[in-house]
Amino acid sequence: MFRTFINAWKITDLRKKLLFTALIILIYRIGSAMPVPFVDIASEGIFGEEAAGTFLTYLSMMTGNAFNYGTLFALSITPYINASIIIQLLAVAIPALQKLSKEGEEGRKKMNKITRYFALGLGFAQSIAYYFFIKSQNMLLTDANGKAFTGFYAVLQAIVVILCYTAGTALVMWLGEQINEKGIGNGISMILFAGIVARMPTTIANLYQYMDRGGAYFVLVPIAAIALVGMIFFIVWMDNGERKIPIQYAKRVVGRKMYGGQNTHMPIKVNMCGVLPVIFASSVLSILPTIAMFAPGEEGGFWNKLTTVWLGQTHPFYGTIYFIFIIFFAYFYAAIQYNPIEMADNLRKNSGSIPGIRPGKPTVSYITNILNRMTLIGALLLSVVAMFPIIYSQIAGLFTEYGMNLAVGGTSIIIMVGVALETEKQLESQMMMRHYKGFLD
């Protein structure tokens, strides 16, 4: 991987793309530390260790701690992710959107435009929720007497804070699009990657704090560290795994030349959806707790328990729903990315066939069965990686007084490793286009 980046750096065009991507990430990190008018940034964050394992920890992880400190990019890219999920689900249910999504490049641009506008609407709604949240945490500036603003100044304060967070959401979306157009990697993934990496020192510091407590932690922390490193190797292995469907092309005579006749294969990856199922599953599970910022409900009531206890990352209910959502989104995006009918039709048009399988419907059925099996295997492996830290946290709680929160560890590692591998592959393809040998050669 490092050799790939070194070789890419030697190419002027790729070096410019890498520098541009680094510049965008730097701007994002500056925005993540930039204060908002009327908001008093807490030196130790809005919530502390008592919030460990809750959805607040997840949002803080996804935003690189910006959510915890109430800075400009506190909402980060989460409104855009949620908007993408909703629009793509609606595209399956609404014929007009489904037709638009199949209209090629123009249709894709229109769908992206709809997603952006919807993301702004969600960003505005989440900004209102976040305003009430930081207000409940006494994070808003007060008058000279230490009292909250009233009347006109209270309204002005609310408008400024909400608009700033909405503008922050729009700016993060724009930064992601700039990476897509002029940089390297996927914009959304790179921003999430930057946020998670920025939070790594805090995660490492938390592990050291567990060690200071002594006792069983002297055994549990090293095991957790070794397991997390092992997860990295496992994710790399899973990402490189694929099923090769043999393809045989018939010979064709065009004029005086003969074409085809070669044998090749169609690769079907184990983890064909990458990190998307994990990102989207986590984002969907954060929607209800976000709504709870508006209406926390009665203390001890069903709604309050659902959003504060059951949807906490360390609760078995959360783990079960998380597992189901990962599998659902894995199948959902596999269905979007791969169309067995089109794949079989393309083979027929190019005089290709799968040995032992008749063209037409049998080929479609064969490809569909393989896709379903590979999707299931990939989804289960992805779920195991995502769930392992949650299960380990539960086991650690049996042997220690304070427990051990590693709930977001699996999600973080999957996103980081997945984004790094996707970026490496994109660099490899760029170098291959320029006839430059890279790591995979």
PLM region spans:
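N-terminal cationic and glycine-rich segments that engage phosphates or anionic surfaces
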Residues: 1-101, 106-441
